């Protein structure tokens, strides 16, 4: 593997808005599956603390910590019963304070999930709300009378299937839940509710965290006529008119007084709307887009009816957002998270999955314009899991999709194959630390079964191999942060190359008269390229023994090259 050099002659400071998060690398931790310190089979905060030196070695700057708040765990912590307490299985508030302090000693910041579209039905706010129709917190949630015939108020459906309305016999009304019935939606129309949210956010920021990943934020505004949906799907609609008043207030009242990173999960946002969400004056620092990771999901969202796609579709999704960010705003670069399957299974043919293709895939996304996110295990090449039956799965969405497939006439084998391909449990299997029992994740039986390939794919093996994917990610991070090319990677203009190729993905980045090209072969066959530019120097590659020709390039299967090119091109 061709290595990169350390920065020797850093370029002069650029005259632009250089917020700290624009040059940071974020590592997402799903605590339940990261490292278990006490042998109960569940990852915890002390486990995260014990692995901080591993993350420091990788070179990341920020940890995004998935929910650790007090929760009944109906949806793995996204059903919060107390925003200002830690779930017992993860530890205590003292553990959280220690994590913040220990991370700070290593120059690592912590951001948390902010889940404010809904709470748990066991949150004190909801318990008060459902206790009496006249309670002052009744309007903190969305309650409606049913129809005269006894049916729910409208035909809206929840993300997890079925009606998004749940009947409460005590008060004889329905409450709204966009997700599980254990996750009632908050009523953002109520100013007292909004102020309570802002107060909670401020409390966490003053405790020392450095920002939030804002969960499902485009769900917070509902159509106030609550009319039936007449679309092909009746799933509750997102990004409704009037949402920007709420988001602007959230930013001003809770975010603006602190120098923080905010990244929004914002389904339903078009490219035209990106400036409002993530422009220089947007509501958030950046947002997660879905087009490039959901190419295989059709409009109906049925995993068992996958949408066909090819490399041109992936390239267009990337190009559309990158071209926008040339002019304004900032991107969140990612291929994996806790809601997605593993990227190697999604983007690489099964027979071609391995270190070479994994390094190619890492190169392609990591050097785009934006802040890169690495999901736990991605840096060692963890892959999807194939459990033998649906009973082995924990993910609510997987269970719903499986039974929906059976209802629509698919066989058990076909339904399970869809779950293998798309389940959120693919990314939630415990982190593979070594080849010992339970992959070194825990001394006890893990809450979710370990992937069977843990003996070959694990951290211990990766750290022993100088040519491993782990060290390749480490080099990519160095390239972004401490090389002569750091500023062109962070701030350079994006330009498509070979845009019509079905096998090659390539782009250029240019800043202050310095230009680099990223060229990757997504195929298992060698390809020869005639170049319209001159390669001056190869900066990084996933192959050894490169044959360099100034205006011609031969790429071997899944080969990727980062090179400096003539800036006059």
Tell where the protein language model's regions lie, with residue ranges.
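Hydrophobic "anchor" residues on beta-strands that sit immediately upstream
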Residues: 109, 113, 211, 261, ...
């Amino acid at each position: 593997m061709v290595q990169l050099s350390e920065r020797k002659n850093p370029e002069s400071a650029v005259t632009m808005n250089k917020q700290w998060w624009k040059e940071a690398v974020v590592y997402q931790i799903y605590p339940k599956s990261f490292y278990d310190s006490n042998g109960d089979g569940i990852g915890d905060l002390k486990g995260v603390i014990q692995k901080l030196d591993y993350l420091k070695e990788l070179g990341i700057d920020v940890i995004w910590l998935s929910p650790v708040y007090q929760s009944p765990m109906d949806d793995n912590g996204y059903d919060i019963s107390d925003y200002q307490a830690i779930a017992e299985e993860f530890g205590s508030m003292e553990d959280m304070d220690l994590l913040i302090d220990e991370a700070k000693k290593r120059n690592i910041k912590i951001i948390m999930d902010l889940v404010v579209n809904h709470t748990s039905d066991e949150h004190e706010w909801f318990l008060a709300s459902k206790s009496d129709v006249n309670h002052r917190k009744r309007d903190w949630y969305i309650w409606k009378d049913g129809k005269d015939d006894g049916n729910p108020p409208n035909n809206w459906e929840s993300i997890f299937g079925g009606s998004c309305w749940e009947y409460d016999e005590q008060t004889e009304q329905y409450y709204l839940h966009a997700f599980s019935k254990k996750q009632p939606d908050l009523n953002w129309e109520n100013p007292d509710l909004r102020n309570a949210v802002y107060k909670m956010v401020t409390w966490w920021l003053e405790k020392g965290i450095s920002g939030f990943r804002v969960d499902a934020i485009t769900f917070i505004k509902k159509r106030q006529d609550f009319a039936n949906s007449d679309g092909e799907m009746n799933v509750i609609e997102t990004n409704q008119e009037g949402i920007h008043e709420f988001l602007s207030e959230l930013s001003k009242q809770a975010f603006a007084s602190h120098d923080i990173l905010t990244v929004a999960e914002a389904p339903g946002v078009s490219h035209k709307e990106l400036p409002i969400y993530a422009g220089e004056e947007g509501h958030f620092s950046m947002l997660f887009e879905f087009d490039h990771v959901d190419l295989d999901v059709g409009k109906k969202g049925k995993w068992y009816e996958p949408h066909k796609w090819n490399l041109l579709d992936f390239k267009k999704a990337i190009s559309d957002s990158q071209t926008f960010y040339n002019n304004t705003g900032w991107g969140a670069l990612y291929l994996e998270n806790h809601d997605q399957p593993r990227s190697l299974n999604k983007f690489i043919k099964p027979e071609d999955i391995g270190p070479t293709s994994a390094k190619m895939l890492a190169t392609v996304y990591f050097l785009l314009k934006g802040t890169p996110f690495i999901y736990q295990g991605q840096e060692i090449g963890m892959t999807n899991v194939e459990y033998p039956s649906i009973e082995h799965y924990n993910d609510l969405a997987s269970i719903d999709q499986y039974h929906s497939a059976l209802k629509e006439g698919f066989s058990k084998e076909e339904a399970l194959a869809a779950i293998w391909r798309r389940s959120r449990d693919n990314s939630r299997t415990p982190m593979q630390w070594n080849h010992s029992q339970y992959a070194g994740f825990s001394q006890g039986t893990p809450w979710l079964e370990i992937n069977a390939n843990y003996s070959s794919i694990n951290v211990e093996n990766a750290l022993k191999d100088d040519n491993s994917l782990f060290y390749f990610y480490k080099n990519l991070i160095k390239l972004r942060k401490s090389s002569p090319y750091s500023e062109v990677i962070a701030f350079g203009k994006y330009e498509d190359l070979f845009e019509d190729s079905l096998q090659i993905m390539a782009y250029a980045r240019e800043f202050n008269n310095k230009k680099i090209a990223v060229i990757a072969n997504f195929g298992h066959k060698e390809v020869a390229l005639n170049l319209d530019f001159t390669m001056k120097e190869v900066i990084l590659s996933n192959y050894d023994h490169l044959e360099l020709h100034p205006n011609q390039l031969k790429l071997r299967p899944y080969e990727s090259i980062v090179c400096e090119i003539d800036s006059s091109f």
